[in-house]
């Protein structure tokens, strides 16, 4: 049975205690840094800058992730996928043949970024994932280029840097194999954790802000309870999914 666990702690403290190559793949979304006074980068949700959500009491941290973080990340993981890698060219200081492009399928006239980039350590071709993600306009299961008609099925936003579960599911299907151990150092909304749980992958995540940790715990509990209700059927689907990789 797979292990899926999250910790409310600073990932730097945790990584310093880890052995080399503790994880097969780290899929991370470190803090890009403040780009405007009084705002934050919303790279995961809108691709632009906006005010802090009113229902969140904790202040969003603005400090850009430093080189020490990447040094530890490369030490504790065999491969890496780093969202916002274009912001960290100097800190990463490594070439990449395989970038991931997330096309958000924005309609014309939207002022936010059309896509987000992820640096990867893989020696393969650049890959594109297309999935609509603009406010209430979210992609449909099975065809992310088309808008979900029933808004009640949309993912609820609980973090300013949230990415869709579908994106992490696609990443895991294309860049992992059964038995891999996954790391997320900036857990945020927990989308990465949910995708790993559904696919039966070992996962460890860290989130130091308690308000976001608690929100993702609640979200994960709701999702995992639904999955567990249909465990036998899901097990068959998981096996078929990985057999097709």
Where is each model-derived feature located?
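Conserved SAM-binding strand-loop segment of SAM-dependent methyltransferases
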Residues: 3-13, 229-231
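Short, well-ordered alpha-helical scaffold segments within catalytic/effector domains
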Residues: 8, 12, 66-70, 165-169
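Sequence-level motif detector for i,i+2 pairs with an aromatic at +2
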Residues: 1-4, 114
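A short acidic, glycine-rich active-site loop
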Residues: 52-64
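Short beta->alpha connector loops
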Residues: 10-13, 63, 85-87
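Generic secondary-structure boundary/loop-capping signal
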Residues: 9-12, 57, 116
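A short glycine-rich, Lys/Arg-flanked "PGG" loop and its adjoining helix->strand segment in the class I
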Residues: 63-79
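Class I S-adenosyl-L-methionine
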Residues: 17-28, 32-55, 74-245
């Amino acid at each position: 049975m797979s292990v899926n666990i999250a910790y409310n702690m600073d990932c730097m403290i945790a990584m310093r205690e880890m052995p080399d190559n503790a994880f097969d793949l780290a899929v991370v979304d470190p803090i890009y840094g403040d780009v405007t006074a009084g705002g934050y980068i919303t790279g995961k949700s809108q691709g632009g800058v906006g005010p802090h959500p009113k229902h969140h009491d904790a202040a969003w941290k603005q400090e850009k992730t430093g080189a020490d973080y990447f040094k530890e990340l490369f030490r504790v993981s065999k491969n890496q996928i780093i969202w916002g890698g274009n912001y960290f060219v100097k800190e990463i200081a490594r070439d990449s043949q395989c970038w991931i492009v997330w096309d958000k399928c924005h309609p014309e006239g939207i002022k936010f970024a059309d896509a987000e980039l992820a640096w990867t350590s893989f020696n393969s071709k650049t890959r594109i994932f297309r999935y609509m993600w603009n406010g209430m306009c979210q992609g449909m299961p099975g065809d992310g280029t088309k808008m979900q008609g029933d808004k009640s099925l949309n993912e609820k936003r609980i973090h300013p840097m949230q990415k869709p579960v579908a994106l992490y599911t696609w990443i895991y299907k294309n860049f992992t194999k059964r038995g891999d151990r996954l790391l997320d150092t900036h857990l945020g909304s927990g989308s990465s954790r949910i995708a790993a749980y559904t696919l039966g992958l070992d996962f460890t995540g860290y989130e130091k802000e308690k308000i976001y940790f608690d929100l993702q715990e609640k979200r994960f509990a709701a999702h995992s309870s639904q999955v567990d209700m249909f465990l036998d059927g899901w097990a068959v689907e998981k096996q078929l999914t990985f057999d097709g990789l």
